[in-house]
Amino acid sequence: DGISLFLVVLTGILFPLVIVGIDPHHNETSYFAWMLLLQAGVMGSFLALDLFLFFVMFEIVLVPMYFLIGGWGYDQRVYAATKFFLYTMAGSAFMLVGIIATVSLAQRDLGVVTFDLVRIAEGASFSTNAARWLFVSFAIAFAVKVPLFPFHTWLPDAHTQAPTGGSVILAGVLLKMGTYGFLRFGVYLFPEAAMWARPVLFTLAVIGIIYGAIAATMQRDLKRLVAYSSVAHLGFIVLGTFALTSQAVTGAVIQMVSHGVSTGALFLLVGMIYERRHTREIAELRGIQHVAPIFAGVFTVVMLSSVGLPGLNGFVGEFLILIGSFGPARWWTVVATVGVVLAALYLLWAYQRVF
């Protein structure tokens, strides 16, 4: 449907590009096997309408990503892979409890044990308190996966230490499993609880937008800067998701795909720079446009799409989110617009010094 279609297409495009276009340099057979298992898990997560199947696919993704970071990453790869695994596993434990409780409570209304998402959403009724606790159990898992502030600390380390292909997939589709989960499962199963919790989620999203932008301006590693920019961009998606207006939700879905394209491309380009310069330190990367003018032009277009320049893919989703969120989340939206300005500042600052 409209929620998962574009994410499935994005997954189907990014994985072949990464597999064909990026050389893992060693243990190619194992690398490609983990990549294909990772693709199966991501596809399954976006296609599942069964709570148990979704949980299994959500967890399957952890294993290949752990080995991709730990086996083909950089100096601190084992630390980053372990941190990613433990954070996400801890969040998923809450979702497992929530799924078991949801199915158990739904059995009273449905008369049968079922994990079917549509059947539970349309046929089961939960008390106010039960719905709130169940929503929180799902929300914790998705907040870690997005990641929302303050669950974000695993992301910069994972991105910085992951191989280029791992970073492209992590930014392009893996993080969207969290935002997709909020929309597909959290809001759909527990709409009233989502309305109850959204002031907290608005606040965390906006903090993530501002914090991610400020943290990005302080980075000296180009890849880590792009990683923190993801924290800010995903804050916009969560803001739009819980505004629950047609414009904001449409913008959130569009922004999921746009972020996957633009930030995935940024990580790919940063990886190309590292392959040739063997450093990601911004201070050591001056003057690239003099030796690679076409590459500099491509980087400029991708960077401006990440900023949200009108006419490029990053603008539409961000604009719809801000317009659609202004009514239900006026002051949060005003603060979020500051993040748009900060995004332009840190990306242009980095571009000026690198190129």
Task: For every predicted segment, state its role.
Residues 21-30, 74-79, 156-158:
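Membrane-interface helix-boundary motifs at transmembrane edges
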Residues 149, 263-267, 333-355:
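Predominantly late transmembrane helices and immediately cytosolic-facing juxtamembrane segments
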Residues 16, 40, 90, 182, ...:
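Hydrophobic residues within the alpha-helical transmembrane core of Major Facilitator Superfamily
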Residues 2-42:
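Hydrophobic alpha-helical transmembrane segments in multi-pass integral membrane proteins
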Residues 2-11, 51-64, 131-144, 194-206, ...:
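Structural signature of hydrophobic alpha-helical transmembrane segments
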Residues 4-6, 30, 51-54, 83, ...:
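Residue-level recognition of membrane-helix boundary sites in multi-pass small-molecule transporters
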Residues 33-37, 41-130, 215-228, 232-282:
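Alpha-helical multi-pass transmembrane bundles of energy-transducing inner-membrane proteins
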Residues 93-152, 157, 182-200, 248, ...:
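Juxtamembrane/interfacial segments at transmembrane-helix boundaries in multi-pass membrane proteins
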